[in-house]
A protein has these predicted regions:
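N-terminal redox-cofactor-binding region of secreted/periplasmic oxidoreductases
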Residues: 1-404
């Protein structure tokens, strides 16, 4: 889904620039996925349900963000959740009755279980629930799905409430700035059907446009570094040097592997009919996306993992048309993404101009801190370590190597 949206009019099409430590094969520019749809990235992401590490929340609270300790935010996670496997995961960490459906994918291919077996053979711990008390290891995670169907934030929250009199959703609209009067946010300006419009509020404005668009809107609204705003011809409402700075994001490196597997195509007409009728079978899963690793590098402890491995592929291919068609080669492809969870490198979001429709300048500055690269290499080696197990040798899991 993410690859389908990328490059289309359903994507913001963000690109970083002037990268000195990464993105060498693309002239110092890397793409940043962001869905331009109602529901945002929950419409195209991998649906994996991970709340984040409690230490992260406690660290944010220690920075002065009142109300953000793990003990303070946990009740809101529980309030949001409708866990379809509550008897398995327990009510201390999970709950039912909320708007967001959470459960494992109904279908996992045999290779997914083989990966867990390989993880054990490689010496990694197995976690039954990364949202519980075992925060590191390999595990089969829950997802934001219900009966094999994606549940985006729009489907979970907006669709059930769309007939409420106090809810108005403006589609095909782009917010261009927050309106500030006498030091208070009183509304927003937005563009729709070829014209700028304004909506006002009597209470508050909540800006929740993501880690790129939120600072972009603030800068366009005159909130940010004074010198930068003045250079763009924008009236300064509030001189806040921090707006747009301290940018950081998860860095990942994708490894492609081939495996020899003579199974039949999963995505055939029989699978389609099963999914349409019962929301079960191969199409109710997401390949090996349900297998995730949260690992601790040599620079941290198991209760605060700084590396992640998430997996893509295995059953993405489709049959030629006839039911039960066999693969011609028996060779499949899987991707293991090694992720840096707590990067120290910092970049910046800034304006290219005062035109709200011109993309902001994104300088991620990823891998500028040597320790980030060290940890990323550890994550890559952890992924490769899986191949040196009996469970993966049975699949002849082989790293694809492309000469530079």
């Amino acid at each position: 889904m993410a690859e389908t949206i990328a490059g289309s009019n359903l994507s913001w099409g963000y690109q970083s620039s002037n990268e000195s430590y990464a993105c060498f094969s693309t002239n110092g520019s890397c793409p940043y996925a962001a869905a331009r749809v109602l529901g945002g990235c929950t419409v195209h992401n991998g649906m994996v349900y991970l709340r984040g590490n409690p230490t992260d929340y406690n660290n944010w609270a220690a920075m002065g963000n009142e109300g953000w300790t793990w003990d303070e935010v946990k009740p809101f996670f529980l309030k949001a959740e409708d866990n379809g496997e509550i008897d398995r995961v327990g009510r201390f960490w999970h709950s039912t009755g909320g708007p967001l459906s959470v459960e494992r994918f109904p279908y996992e291919p045999p290779f997914a279980n083989a990966m867990l077996e390989a993880a054990e053979q490689a010496g990694f711990r197995i976690s039954q629930d990364f949202n519980g008390d075992v925060l590191s290891g390999f595990g089969m995670v829950q997802s934001t799905t219900k009966n094999g169907v994606r549940r985006s934030s729009a489907a979970s929250y907006l669709r059930p409430s769309r007939n409420r009199e106090n809810l108005h959703v403006s589609l095909n609209s782009t917010v261009t700035r927050v309106i500030i009067e006498d030091g208070k946010a009183v509304g927003v300006e937005y563009f729709k059907n070829g014209e700028f419009k304004i909506v006002r509020t009597t209470r508050e404005v909540i800006l929740s446009a993501g880690n790129i668009k939120s600072p972009h809107i603030l800068l366009l609204s005159g909130i940010g570094p004074q010198e930068h705003l003045e250079s763009m011809g924008i009236a300064v409402v509030k001189d806040l040097p921090g707006v747009g700075s301290n940018y950081h994001d998860h860095v990942f490196f994708m490894l492609n592997f081939t495996i020899n597997d003579p199974d039949t195509y999963e995505n055939n007409w029989a699978a389609a009919n099963e999914y349409l009728a019962f929301q079960t079978g191969p199409l109710s899963g997401h390949g090996i996306t349900g297998i995730v690793a949260q690992l601790a590098s040599s620079k941290t402890t198991p209760d605060y993992p700084d590396m992640q491995i998430y997996n893509i592929g295995y059953d993405a291919a489709c049959a030629p048309g006839e039911i039960g068609a066999l693969r011609s080669t028996g060779e499949r492809s899987v991707d293991l993404a090694s992720v840096l969870l707590h990067p120290k490198s910092r970049g910046r979001i800034s304006l290219a101009s005062n035109d709200p429709f011109e993309q902001p300048l994104i300088w991620s500055n990823i891998l500028s801190e040597p320790s980030d690269l060290d940890i990323l290499v550890e994550a890559i080696n952890s992924a490769i370590k899986l191949t040196n197990t009996d469970a993966m040798r049975a699949y002849n899991m082989t790293l694809s190597v492309t000469a530079l």
